């Protein structure tokens, strides 16, 4: 048995220790180097990046909404203004139990089921950490009640905002329009137009009328403030502020009192009236009835209220003055006369015998005159005074649809008028091409005949009727109807500028005076179809009435409004201007199905007297309904 070596090799152990210590030291040195390198990267290389991130957590940019421009009438009366409202808002991510919080708020701020439904709808389309309205238009009592109980509702606060308000309600809805909450379509459009950033602090946008058309002018430029916040998100101090730029105030050509007066006259009727100054094209009144209160839409209309408007058989949502399309009827006869004279189809001396009907050559088809026993021998002026259909059947036949549609297009029919409202329809000025495309059928000669009296396939809006009337008054010089009078910029009024358009025909032909003389005869001469309404006026009026058929009669039938359903009765129309020798006002009017009140001539006289005399109680002769119906041609 060998003896165990009890001696240790201290030299070897020492060398091993040194090697291990060296490895450990090198490891520590390497790790320290990595740490120093990383620290250098964080503190030196990426200092700016991390400083920015830190500031973003500490410093916030808060957008500041601009004040929306005020809309005034021509006399400086505010038609759309801003007022401060308070609303309660919630950031759901800061609330432990949203439903319990909503339930608790019911008794504090009188929260309703509709309010909660609107909140949930808005929450569904909002981003996280967005403050969402719970209830708007808080009363002073509700604000005070919440202030006392605010400690119970973390994540909920009351904020003040400027809200649009329309003090005259339904009287101006179809002109002024309204603003309402920005929706997804608005966001998409603003983003595509590069304007979304300017709406960072804005809840509303123009949806209709002037508010929509002049949105860029009225909105202004969003400002912002740079604030420092603590770790709870509360503002500690303001670092910088760039104030918002308020939107521009605008002044309209409208006369509020005239607008309200006409709306009162049309109460209960489906009707439209456009009043213009033919010297400038400025719209003095644009009324469409029935209407509705635009304030309903500002904070978001309830589904119940919107459904009621949408399903109303009287269609209050439609602006009849610019979107209602009707056969223009006999109101176009003066323009057809000027066109036929200008085209050489007729002359000043052309005459025609009217037996009460006109027969299409080579056919047994007869077209009846509204006066079944006829008007006898007619020239151009008398055919306008008595509104002979037969005379204009012949004119339409001789002109043909190509020339007729071309000339009426020059008067603006079938085209947008250029009025500063997005809600406009162009109507229809029929052509061969239109019929082929629409019905896959050729144009027949018989289609042309009713076009000569503003019937058939021809449809137009009251604003188009107004523009055509101004062209006639100005002897072919075109005035675009407009609502904007001026814009307030830097303390100055910048006026709206009438665009230049080529004149219609020869402004020195004398044909314009011939047509206007015919309209003068309508209102003033014994054989004029509307003389009983206007002959007694202390100023001179020129007018032209029209009847647009809704329900077709058989050859042996006679029209009787009392035996026809109300919706099938004829539309009554009239255009007029005054004073005759120096026109200052032009009016176009339509009463759907004849209206619910006085005759169209009575209403026209009342409007003109109100403007020319300031007389709101025009004394007119008693009306015989049967005679009135016959005279409204």
Question: Language-model segments: which ranges?
Answer:
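Periplasmic/cell-envelope proteins involved in peptidoglycan metabolism and beta-lactam response
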Residues: 1-303, 325, 347-348, 353, ...
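Beta-lactam-recognizing serine transpeptidase/beta-lactamase-like catalytic domain environment
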Residues: 2-11, 80, 229-239, 279-331, ...
């Amino acid at each position: 048995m060998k003896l165990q070596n009890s001696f240790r090799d201290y030299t070897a152990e020492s060398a091993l220790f040194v090697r291990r210590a060296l490895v450990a030291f090198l490891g520590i040195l390497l790790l320290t180097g990595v740490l120093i390198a990383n620290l250098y990267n964080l503190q030196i290389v990426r200092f700016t990046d991390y400083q920015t991130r830190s500031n973003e957590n500490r410093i916030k940019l808060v957008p500041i909404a601009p004040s929306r421009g005020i809309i005034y009438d021509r006399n400086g009366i505010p038609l759309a203004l801003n007022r401060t409202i308070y609303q309660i808002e919630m950031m759901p991510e800061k609330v432990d139990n949203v439903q319990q919080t909503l339930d608790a708020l019911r008794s504090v701020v009188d929260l309703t089921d509709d309010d909660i439904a609107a909140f949930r709808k808005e929450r569904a389309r909002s981003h996280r950490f967005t403050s969402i309205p719970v209830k708007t238009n808080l009363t002073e009592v509700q604000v005070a009640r919440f202030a006392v109980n605010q400690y119970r509702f973390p994540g909920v606060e009351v904020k003040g905002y400027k809200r649009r308000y329309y003090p005259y309600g339904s009287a101006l809805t179809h002109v002024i329009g309204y603003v309402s909450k920005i929706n997804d379509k608005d966001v998409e459009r603003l983003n595509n137009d590069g304007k979304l950033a300017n709406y960072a602090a804005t809840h509303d946008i123009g949806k209709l009328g002037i508010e929509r058309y002049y949105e860029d002018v009225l909105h202004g430029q969003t400002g912002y403030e740079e604030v420092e916040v603590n770790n709870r998100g509360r503002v500690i101090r303001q670092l910088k502020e760039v104030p918002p730029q308020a939107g521009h105030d605008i002044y309209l050509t409208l006369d509020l009192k005239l607008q309200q007066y006409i709306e009162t006259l049309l109460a209960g009727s489906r009707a439209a009236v456009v009043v213009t100054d033919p010297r400038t094209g400025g719209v003095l009144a644009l009324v469409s009835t029935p209407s509705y209160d635009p304030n309903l839409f500002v904070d978001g209309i309830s589904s119940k209220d919107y459904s009621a408007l949408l399903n109303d058989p009287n269609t209050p949502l439609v602006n009849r003055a610019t979107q209602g399309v009707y056969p223009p009827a006999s109101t176009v006869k003066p323009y057809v006369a000027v066109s036929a004279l200008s085209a050489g189809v007729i002359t000043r001396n052309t005459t025609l015998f009217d037996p009460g009907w006109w027969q299409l050559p080579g056919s047994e088809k007869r077209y009846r005159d509204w006066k079944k026993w006829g008007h006898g021998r007619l020239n151009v002026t008398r055919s306008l005074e008595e509104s002979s259909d037969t005379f204009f059947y012949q004119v339409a036949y001789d002109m043909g649809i190509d020339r007729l549609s071309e000339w009426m297009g020059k008067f603006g029919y079938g085209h947008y008028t250029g009025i500063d409202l997005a809600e406009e329809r162009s109507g229809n000025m029929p052509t061969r091409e239109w019929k082929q495309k629409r019905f896959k059928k050729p144009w027949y000669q018989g289609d042309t005949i009713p076009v000569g009296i503003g019937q058939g396939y021809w449809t137009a809006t009251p604003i188009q009727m107004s523009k055509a009337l101004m062209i006639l008054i100005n002897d072919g010089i075109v005035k675009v109807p407009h609502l904007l009078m001026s814009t307030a910029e830097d303390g100055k009024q910048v006026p709206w500028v009438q665009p230049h358009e080529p004149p219609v025909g020869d402004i020195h032909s004398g044909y314009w005076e011939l047509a206007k003389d015919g309209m003068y005869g309508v209102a003033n001469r014994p054989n004029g179809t509307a003389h009983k309404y206007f002959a007694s006026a202390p100023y001179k009026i020129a007018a032209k009435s029209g009847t647009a058929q809704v329900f077709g009669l058989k050859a042996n039938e006679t029209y009787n409004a009392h035996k026809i359903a109300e919706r099938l009765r004829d539309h009554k129309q009239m255009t007029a201007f005054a004073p005759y020798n120096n026109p200052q006002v032009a009016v176009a009017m339509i009463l759907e199905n004849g209206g619910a009140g006085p005759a169209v001539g009575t209403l026209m006289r009342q409007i003109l007297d109100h403007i020319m005399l300031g007389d709101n109680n025009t004394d007119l002769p008693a009306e015989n309904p049967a005679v009135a119906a016959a005279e409204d041609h």
